[in-house]
Amino acid sequence: MPEQHLTRRDILAAVGSAAVIATAPNAVSPAHAADTEGGTVTTSDGVKLKHMAAGAGRPLVMIPGWSQTAAQFKYQIAGLAQTYRVVAVDMRGHGESQKVNHGYKISRLAKDVHDVLHKLDLHDVTLLGHSMGCSVIWCYWDMYGPERLSKLVLVDQMPFITANPTWSPDEKRDAGAILDAAALYDLYNRLTGPDAAKTTEGFVGGMATKAMPADQKNWIIQQNFKLPRRHAADLLYNHATQDWRDVIPRIKIPTLVVGGKASLVPWTSQVWISKQIKGSRLEVFEENEGGAHFMFMEAHDKFNRIVSEFIA
């Protein structure tokens, strides 16, 4: 498959082509749901974070992506809690966590994860991040190193979202950049403007394969709206301007890198990441098996098997 680079026009076309979203149904429940517990952790700056947990054994802590929720890991909670202690965290402002007006920066979210691991007294943790959750992990590593961690699972996040116009094609490919500065500001302004809902529907709706059922896609979009759009825009801007290419090669614990051939995140950037982390494992899902940005939902059985084998 040729390398994938989205232009500013591609991004704006996705944003502008949202389908009409009906009232979203409840989450499509996994066939065998685990007994899930709910809990609250208060961060060092007083914000109440909600989390879902199930199972017993070695801990697997999962960090959702930008504007995503812990509930979107429902298939992992159901499938992996039979073997592991699975914890999914709603980051500040996201999901069921407290809505506050500060802290929507990757560095603060990394500190929040650090707070969660300490408050729940978790050790030997496999830390899994999806999308922006990977950036949170990279920031955690930059600040705390391997503290309380044993393994990492990095799911579908490029090292740097926003391209420098002076980059060579190879630099752009390896970074995985899909925006330029003008497109980033345009997206920010749309998320803070009167068309914020339509913008979200188009942007997030374009992250799945065509095979994803409409009700599941609509539910994902409704989960996104749990983070107020102003905070979503602020966080996206901070996220999109972080360059992790100097941090990734310093990761020294076993790491699984997961990408998708049909994802908006260029799969070639996942190859670059895997090459920077010595001994890492790379898995790239094909489009016909649900290999877009939400492969952990669209191809949850295969995803869970790969993660379980990696942790074991």
Regions found by a protein language model. Give the residues of each.
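N-terminal secretory signal peptides and thylakoid transit peptides that target proteins
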Residues: 2-18
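Active-site loop/oxyanion-hole signature of alpha/beta-hydrolase fold enzymes
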Residues: 44, 52-54, 88-132, 136, ...
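Conserved HGGG/HGGXW glycine-rich cap/lid loop of the alpha/beta-hydrolase fold
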Residues: 47, 52-99
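Flexible "cap/lid" loop of the alpha/beta hydrolase fold
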Residues: 138, 149-191
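Hydrophobic, aromatic-rich cap/lid helix
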Residues: 217-246
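Conserved loop-alpha-helix segment in the C-terminal half of the alpha/beta-hydrolase fold
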Residues: 254-291
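Catalytic histidine-centered segment of alpha/beta-hydrolase-like enzymes
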Residues: 288-300, 304
